[in-house]
């Protein structure tokens, strides 16, 4: 998977970057739109198949560029229709992409990193350690692979993929530039034309990057909350020690307010038996979210080996949901999908090569500080 050709991978370029590329090889900017449609609308990875592109330009493209997605290692289909792709990226690690069909829509859950540095105690991805950020081509390549698998082009109706959630392996905000570029392609009509309201980024709470996100792109935001107080969240989601709840929720409120249009924050809360599922936790959550425009998604824990956690009983789940409902919150309980192929929330593992030691997993968080990262060059998005 490593690019040893020196060619630029067009799969991960946004429209402005694609236009710059064509100018750099002495071509008109409009060629960007032609080629992007071939790549994203029709899943083409061979320049020779681009019939409205002249032979001379096709030869020039062959010499300087390529269209290269991640390598599909396996595809599994659950009894409930959920699909999971395991794909190998340039680092040699494998990451997972999940498609969930439900109620007339199709949601694609996309990974942003091979492994994860945040080490949330109830998440199987965190147990794998951290290997590498995915490039923008490797992120959008998951959408490209899934779209090709369904044999569809992104028409406005009857499309298989209607929603994309950055909720797969990794913390998206720790791979900021590549994730933003991939989401821009998802929403671009030359890409997949998905509505900004139907592209969702989920974060465990990298506060400086939440503020930066609001400056550069308009997508829906989800917060992996999982605990209603700092003491418990420090144990479950260790990044909370750096960005505690008051700081985190203030950033989320700023983000939602900046977008306007009656947008709300999605709160994700994994229910763990005897840990965060008691009535007092629901009451604390009600108080915590009193002034936060949000909807709440409760996620019963999906077991994985040696996790040390259990799924609450159905009665405990209903009790927790009812308490939140009575306080006026919009609350849903996520239906477990794809657990027979290990594709349920929190079960994504992949195969992370050269895993870092646990003590090293926080390097990215420690180095982040309060400064926004400088944009990376498009050449690093291969």
UniProtKB/Swiss-Prot annotation:
Keywords: 4Fe-4S, Cytoplasm, Disulfide bond, Iron, Iron-sulfur, Metal-binding, Methyltransferase, rRNA processing, S-adenosyl-L-methionine, Transferase, tRNA processing. Its cofactor is [4Fe-4S] cluster. [4Fe-4S] cluster binds at residues 116, 120, 123. Residues 102-340 form the Radical SAM core domain. S-adenosyl-L-methionine binds at residues 170-171, 202, 224-226, 302. Its EC number is 2.1.1.192. It is found in: Cytoplasm. This is Dual-specificity RNA methyltransferase RlmN. The lineage of its organism: Bacteria, Pseudomonadati, Pseudomonadota, Gammaproteobacteria, Pseudomonadales.
């Amino acid at each position: 998977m490593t690019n040893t050709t020196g060619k630029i991978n067009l799969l991960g370029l946004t429209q402005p970057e694609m236009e710059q590329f064509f100018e750099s090889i002495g071509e008109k900017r409009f060629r960007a739109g032609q080629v992007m449609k071939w790549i994203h609308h029709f899943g083409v990875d061979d320049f020779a198949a681009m019939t409205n592109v002249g032979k001379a330009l096709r030869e020039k493209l062959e010499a300087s560029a390529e269209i290269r997605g991640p390598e599909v290692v396996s595809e599994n289909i659950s009894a409930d229709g959920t699909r999971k792709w395991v794909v190998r990226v340039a680092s040699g690690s494998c990451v997972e992409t999940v498609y969930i069909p439900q109620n007339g829509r199709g949601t694609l859950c996309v990974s942003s990193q091979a492994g994860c540095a945040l080490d949330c105690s109830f998440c199987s991805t965190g147990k794998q350690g951290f290997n590498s950020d995915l490039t923008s081509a490797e992120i959008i390549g998951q959408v490209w692979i899934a779209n090709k698998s369904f044999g569809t082009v992104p028409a406005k109706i009857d499309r298989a993929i209607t929603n994309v959630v950055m909720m797969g392996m990794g913390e998206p905000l720790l791979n900021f530039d590549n994730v933003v570029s991939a989401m821009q392609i998802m929403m671009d009509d030359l890409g997949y034309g998905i509505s900004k309201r139907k592209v969702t980024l989920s974060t465990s709470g990298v506060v400086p990057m939440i503020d930066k996100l609001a400056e550069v792109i308009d997508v829906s935001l989800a917060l992996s909350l999982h605990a209603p107080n700092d003491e418990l969240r420090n144990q479950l989601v260790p990044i909370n020690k750096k960005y505690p709840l008051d700081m985190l929720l203030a950033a989320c409120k700023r983000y939602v307010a900046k977008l306007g249009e009656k947008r709300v924050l999605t709160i994700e809360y994994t229910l763990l038996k005897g840990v965060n599922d008691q009535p007092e936790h629901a009451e604390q959550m009600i108080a915590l979210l009193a002034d936060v425009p949000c909807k709440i998604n409760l996620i019963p824990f999906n077991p994985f080996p040696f996790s040390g956690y259990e799924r609450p009983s159905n009665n405990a789940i209903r009790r927790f949901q009812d308490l939140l409902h009575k306080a006026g919150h919009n609350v849903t309980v996520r239906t477990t999908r794809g657990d027979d192929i290990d594709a349920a929330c929190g079960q994504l593992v992949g195969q992370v090569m050269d895993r870092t030691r646990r003590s090293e997993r926080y390097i990215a968080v420690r180095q982040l500080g309060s400064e926004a990262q400088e944009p990376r060059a498009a050449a690093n998005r291969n």
